[in-house]
A protein has these predicted regions:
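Conserved catalytic scaffold of divalent metal-dependent phosphoesterases
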Residues: 45, 105-203, 233-236, 240-266
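Binuclear metal-dependent phosphoesterase catalytic core
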Residues: 13-34, 138, 213-266
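Short, flexible loop segments at the rims of nucleotide/cofactor-binding pockets, characterized by
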Residues: 16-19, 43-48, 74-78, 159-164, ...
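Membrane-embedded segments
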Residues: 40-133, 141
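Non-catalytic terminal accessory segments
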Residues: 1-25, 65-66
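Short gly/pro/ser/thr-enriched loop/turn and capping motifs at secondary-structure boundaries
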Residues: 105-106, 211-215
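A structural signal for the hydrophobic beta-strands that form the central parallel beta-sheet
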Residues: 39, 69-70, 205, 246
């Protein structure tokens, strides 16, 4: 019995190493037709080849009309932003790139913040901080909003107890009323999916949870806030005719939860 347990443990360790060093998956979700969106999220300090070329090549093969980066392109402790910059440049050659800050961009160590902002200024992504951009693709006009919520929804007083709660009214204060038409909302934190839908976004693209880090039988284990079994961790969640689209992301250690790029057809 011990012999079998040792073999299982060795196989588990080998798979863990393989998953975290070599795997990169593409998940495709067909929600409509006419526009292809590539969703990249939560890279953190992970690297996928020289200049993150594996990510760029996978996205290129999908021929997207739009590329979304839903936060945590870097980690708060990062000092070398050249891999992130190379990724931005590579993606921009494929399609328009829209991005938002995640909780890590909001809390980058002060000594590195200037270098990070300079890196962004050299590139041509469209950074949305409680702002909106309009894009016409295949005769359809999309209004793309980027939400920068209060950091208290992620961490408060150095911990994860009594976090701030985001309501529809808070979103309206930050973004204004949701307009008519096709509205995409980029919001790093998926836990407020119902509120995003109430605000009126047809599609909300989120990340943050890393798919739950560890997944068993398709269920997420843990959120970054140290909460077990997070409700919105990976996949498509319906709120009437509105949808929350959550990527499991690319970075951080994970098990039975491969790094992913997501392609949505809407």
């Amino acid at each position: 019995m011990l012999y079998i347990a040792v073999i299982i443990l060795i196989l588990l360790v080998l798979y863990f190493i393989y998953e975290n060093l070599f795997m990169l998956t593409v998940r495709r979700e067909k929600l409509g037709s006419g526009i292809r969106i590539a969703h990249v999220s939560d890279l953190h300090k992970r690297r996928f080849g020289m200049n993150n070329e594996r990510i760029v090549e996978r996205v290129k093969a999908e021929k997207p009309d739009i590329i979304i980066i839903s936060g945590d392109l870097v980690s708060r402790s990062e000092t070398d932003f050249s891999p992130a910059e190379a990724l931005l440049k590579g993606l921009h050659e494929l399609a328009p790139v829209y991005m938002i800050y995640g909780n890590h961009e909001q809390s980058i160590y002060r000594e590195n913040l200037r270098a990070f902002k300079k890196m962004l200024s050299r590139n041509q992504e469209i950074l949305l901080k409680n702002g909106c951009a309009e894009l016409t693709v295949n005769d359809r006009t999309l209004k793309i909003y980027g939400l920068l919520e209060d950091y208290g929804v992620y961490k408060k007083n150095g911990g994860y107890r009594k976090l701030e709660v985001l309501k529809e009214s808070d979103i309206e204060k930050l973004l204004g009323k949701c307009p008519d038409g096709e509205v995409l909302l980029l919001a790093h934190n998926p836990f407020f999916g119902e509120e995003y839908a109430k605000w009126g976004a047809k599609y909300t693209l989120s990340g943050h949870v890393h798919g739950g880090s560890v997944r068993f039988f398709g269920k997420a284990l843990l959120s970054p806030e140290r909460r077990f079994f997070p409700k919105y961790a990976k996949g498509v969640y319906d709120f009437g005719d509105k949808k929350l689209l959550v990527s499991a992301g690319l970075g951080k250690l994970r098990l039975f939860n491969p790094p992913e790029i997501v392609i949505y057809e809407i």
